[in-house]
Amino acid sequence: MVKKIGVLTSGGDAPGMNAAVRGVVRTALTQGLEVFGIHDGYLGLVEDRIEKLERHSVSDMINRGGTFLGSARFPEFKEVAVREKAIANLKKHDIDALIVIGGDGSYMGAKKLTEMGYPCIGLPGTIDNDIAGTDYTIGYLTALNTVIDAIDRLRDTSSSHQRISIVEVMGRHCGDLTLMAAIAGGCEYVITPETGLNKEALIQNIQDGIAKGKKHAIIAITELMTDVNALAKEIEAETGRETRATVLGHIQRGGQPGAFDRILASRMGNYGVKLLVEGHGGRCVGIQNEQLVHHDIIDAIENMRRPEKLELYKVAEELF
């Protein structure tokens, strides 16, 4: 029977992580459990930076961006000896189970602990929206609005100067953030890991647009696909139209979470605790068709695939 639980945030921060921690803490206390916060993710777990949390510990946190528990990249957690030390620290505090809030790397850590017999629940916290088994991740829609706001501002200046603007969006190997921002921001071109980058076709499309009287254009592209500044120089050289690249970077992770992410994070935090109370471990939480669901975390990482957004790419193509 679970009496004490731990909670940590790991990997890249995402708006709504604090709301998720709050959901975990408040629900755990309501259920008569003790709850412990672990600072700086798996690194803090190994270094035993663990403190007991009370209701007041999460007061005024629901509207705050980032994560008050802190986060850190910690690749050494892949090592068995390191994970054994983490479990020893959890047992030292008599913590029976752990809730991990983060992205795919964080899930992998939870999976490894699960395989070692320690019960974990994963909550999807990442702006990339790249986690299988859920329609939305915590922080994604807030980041989407941040990107759209930036695109709107770029359009103002691009149209004033008859300029082509390239905007680089986060997402790593997932194009969801770029695709949705491109549709909502009215971008002329969208380039994601799912579409690939065809420079010749892109330049030809831009030239065709100029020939038809197009005065400016915005290209949305997912990070890590190419050097966007070099791409801007190529486009300018081929089209004769001034072209500039803007890398949005970490601004996409910051800011107050929107209403959707606050509610989603609160629901997921609440649900994660209840799963542990009911005796479930080794699960990850998602939302599908507006309903909270849970999956085997090992199966989610190894076998589940995110559905392709073919219809939305078709919409984007027809609107551009």
UniProtKB/Swiss-Prot annotation:
Cofactor(s) listed in the protein's UniProt record: Mg(2+)
Regulation of its activity: Allosterically activated by ADP and other diphosphonucleosides, and allosterically inhibited by phosphoenolpyruvate.
Active site (UniProt): D128
The reaction(s) this protein catalyses: beta-D-fructose 6-phosphate + ATP = beta-D-fructose 1,6-bisphosphate + ADP + H(+)
ATP-binding as UniProt keyword: yes
GO molecular function: 6-phosphofructokinase activity; AMP binding; ATP binding; fructose-6-phosphate binding; identical protein binding; metal ion binding; monosaccharide binding
Main subcellular localisation: cytoplasm
Assembly and interaction partners: Homotetramer.
Binding-site positions, Mg(2+): D104
Subcellular location: Cytoplasm
EC number: 2.7.1.11
Protein name as catalogued: ATP-dependent 6-phosphofructokinase
PANTHER family: ATP-DEPENDENT 6-PHOSPHOFRUCTOKINASE, PHOSPHOFRUCTOKINASE
Residues holding ATP: G12, R73, F74, G103, D104, G105, S106
InterPro entries hit by this protein: ATP_PFK, ATP_PFK_prok-type, PFKA_ATP_prok, Phosphofructokinase_CS, Phosphofructokinase_dom, PKF_sf
BP-aspect Gene Ontology terms: canonical glycolysis; fructose 1,6-bisphosphate metabolic process; fructose 6-phosphate metabolic process
Keyword field: Allosteric enzyme, ATP-binding, Cytoplasm, Glycolysis, Kinase, Magnesium, Metal-binding, Nucleotide-binding, Transferase
Family: Belongs to the phosphofructokinase type A (PFKA) family. ATP-dependent PFK group I subfamily. Prokaryotic clade 'B1' sub-subfamily.
Binding site for ADP: R22, G23, V24, V25, R26, R155, G186, C187, E188, K212, K214, K215, H216
Pathway annotation from the record: Carbohydrate degradation; glycolysis; D-glyceraldehyde 3-phosphate and glycerone phosphate from D-glucose: step 3/4
GO cellular component terms listed in the entry, alphabetical order: 6-phosphofructokinase complex
Organism superkingdom: Bacteria
Catalytic EC class: transferase
Amino acids binding substrate: T126, I127, D128, R163, M170, G171, R172, E223, R244, H250, I251, Q252, R253
UniProt source species: Aliivibrio salmonicida (strain LFI1238) (Vibrio salmonicida (strain LFI1238))
Known function: Catalyzes the phosphorylation of D-fructose 6-phosphate to fructose 1,6-bisphosphate by ATP, the first committing step of glycolysis.
